[in-house]
A protein has these predicted regions:
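Structured helix-beta-strand junction loops
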Residues: 16-17, 42-43, 69, 106, ...
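A contiguous active-site-proximal alpha/beta segment in oxidoreductase catalytic domains
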Residues: 21, 26-85, 95
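C-terminal helix-rich "cap/oligomerization" subdomain common to oxidoreductases
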Residues: 1-4, 12, 42, 126
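Rossmann-like dinucleotide-binding domain that binds NAD(P)(H)
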Residues: 74-142
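Rossmann-fold NAD(P) dinucleotide-binding segment
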Residues: 3-23
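C-terminal glycine/acidic-rich active-site capping loop/insertion
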Residues: 142-166
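Short beta->alpha connector loops
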Residues: 2-4, 26-27, 53-55, 114-116, ...
Length: 166
């Protein structure tokens, strides 16, 4: 979970020439993330970074249109604030990645409201759809969401471990 050590760890993998997966966050700063990708390119090593939530079977079904077009989505995850990492980069990234898994790219406008217990971010996509992310600061560490489709409101997948990456 500590992105500050990922560059050092990844360098050992890159030197071995093995494919590299780095759990979120890829780095504690944008500079570290860029350095990791530059080193992967230098050593010609395939690399990817992701939240395992992207690959939950339910989220993949939603993404692939099994319930119809995603008309909008509301997603949530823990949002533990870690001073060594920017904003949602430590844990909030899980819910943000779930939202993008369901909605795809194209978010063009963002508004945010914060309180002691949560952060809520509302995004508008270029096609007019709206998606939200709730970063839970207090309360249980839960992951999930709701996707709105022509077939109704469908539960998004939560954390199912790392086996879904294989």
């Amino acid at each position: 979970n500590d992105g500050r050590i990922h560059l050092e760890q990844a360098m050992e993998v890159f030197k071995s020439g093995k494919i590299c997966y780095i759990d979120k966050p890829i780095g504690a700063t944008l500079g570290q993330a860029i350095a990791i990708y530059e080193m992967a390119e230098k050593y010609n090593v395939p690399i990817f970074s992701s939240s395992a939530l992207r690959y939950s079977p339910q989220n993949q079904k939603l993404r692939n249109g099994e319930f119809g077009k995603i008309l909008g989505a509301d997603c949530y995850s823990p949002h533990k604030v870690e001073p060594t990492h920017p904003d949602f980069g430590f844990y909030g990234i899980h819910g943000v990645e779930t939202l993008y898994t369901l909605m795809g790219t194209g978010c063009e406008s963002v508004n945010r409201m914060s309180s002691q217990d949560a952060d809520v971010v509302v995004g508008r996509w270029k096609d007019g759809r709206i998606g939200t992310f709730r970063g839970i600061k207090e309360g249980p560490a839960i992951y999930g969401g709701t996707a709105y489709t022509p077939k109704g409101a469908i539960a998004a997948g939560g954390y199912e471990g790392y086996k879904v990456l294989l």
